[in-house]
């Protein structure tokens, strides 16, 4: 049985106060808080097992290597990969997406080709493709969304053609909460011979993922949004594609042999993991995944849907408040503005009430442009939030509106 109060006991930071008020943390879309098991695992690694992986024959190195590869195997199972070799550890989702843009893109995208990017993407799934297009003389095409925040998949036939090489799309919008119809996107892309690159930062947290069922070619996410440490991310890639890709960075541990005449590379995934690995981050992320595997994804999703529904119903009763992203099936992300109230002012007042939300453009400036606004307030819920906190958000917004309109 899903017991949110018991879950909250596992997150030490949720018991602190800010400005003398209980912390109401509604910014998990930016970074999620960490359960005690992750905190203790990271601490133990620094205290007891601090040694480079894949490089030593001594006990500490070998033990750290075993834990690192076990984390890779656990994460592979969690996302539904066919094998652990399809999991590449990176510095984060941004690094994962750039790896594909440089390694796959430079090898397989040419002048006159096109790259399709959805309008609702985070900058990390826009800018690398723009940079690739500039390097290669390719065209960027944009798949728009409608006023409700639903992706216009009906326009795919007019945007995907025989020169489309990459389709970049989010599993769940970090601003609107929209979960696009990925099956339709993948089918259209694959019919044209294009690869599909999915930003899974929000999707992997809200409802989980099965990359083989999704049939995406690449899937990227960050550990810190999945209750894991910062500075660690994952790139899933179909093995046959990873094997065709040249390395993105050169250095130690990604090589097989090195001579001045020729260098040969390690097999996947190691050929994409140059340099000293963030083994603490990877093992910590494995522990976060282990934490998540204790729960039924359907129960997490039902809990978060209840939070979203309660907050939405309460906020809709506030005069002049607009919610952005009303497509059915959205995840637990709620962005809004109040007429006549700047989002930064709203965020500052909520902060003084102990409520942490995100304000600004959310690294999704094209979404702001679509709605003609310079910023939004965003509440993003997690498995440790409560209905009382959803009510606190609404009460805080009501109080802020009264203060700022008087």
How would you name each of these model-derived features?
Residues 1-406:
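Pyridoxal 5′-phosphate
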């Amino acid at each position: 049985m899903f017991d949110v109060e018991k879950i909250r006991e596992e997150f030490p930071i949720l018991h602190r106060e800010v400005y003398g008020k209980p912390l109401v943390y509604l910014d998990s879309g930016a970074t999620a808080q960490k359960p005690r098991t992750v905190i203790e695992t990271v601490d133990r690694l620094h205290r007891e097992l601090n040694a480079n992986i894949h490089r030593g024959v001594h006990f500490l190195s070998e033990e750290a290597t075993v834990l690192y590869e076990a984390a890779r195997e656990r994460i592979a199972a969690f996302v539904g990969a066919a094998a652990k070799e399809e999991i590449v550890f990176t510095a984060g989702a941004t690094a994962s997406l750039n790896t594909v843009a440089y390694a796959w893109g430079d090898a397989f995208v040419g002048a006159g080709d096109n790259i399709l990017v959805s309008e609702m993407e985070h900058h990390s799934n826009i800018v690398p493709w723009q940079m690739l297009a500039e390097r290669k003389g390719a065209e960027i095409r944009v798949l728009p969304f409608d006023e409700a925040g639903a992706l216009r998949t009906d326009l795919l036939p007019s945007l995907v053609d025989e020169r489309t090489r990459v389709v970049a799309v989010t599993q769940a919008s970090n601003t609107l909460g929209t979960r696009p119809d990925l099956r339709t996107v993948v089918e259209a892309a694959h019919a044209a011979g294009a690869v599909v690159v999915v930003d899974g930062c929000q999707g992997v947290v809200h409802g989980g993922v099965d990359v083989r069922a999704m049939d995406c070619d690449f899937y990227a996410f960050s550990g810190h949004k999945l209750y894991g440490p910062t500075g660690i991310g994952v790139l899933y890639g179909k093995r046959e594609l990873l094997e065709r890709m040249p390395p993105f960075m050169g250095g130690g541990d990604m090589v097989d042999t090195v001579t001045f005449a020729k260098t040969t590379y390690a097999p996947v995934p190691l050929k994409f993991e140059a340099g000293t690995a963030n083994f603490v981050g990877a093992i910590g992320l494995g522990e976060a995944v282990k934490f998540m595997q204790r729960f039924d994804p359907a129960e997490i999703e039902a809990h978060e849907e209840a939070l979203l529904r309660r907050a939405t119903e309460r906020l809709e009763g506030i005069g002049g408040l607009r919610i952005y992203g009303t497509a059915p099936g959205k995840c637990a992300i709620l962005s809004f503005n109040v007429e006549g109230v700047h989002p930064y002012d709203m965020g500052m007042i909520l902060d003084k009430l102990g409520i942490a939300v995100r304000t600004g453009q959310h690294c999704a400036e094209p979404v702001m442009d679509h709605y003609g606004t310079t910023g939004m307030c965003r509440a993003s819920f997690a498995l440790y939030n409560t209905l009382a906190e959803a009510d606190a958000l609404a009460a805080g917004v009501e109080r802020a509106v009264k203060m700022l309109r008087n």
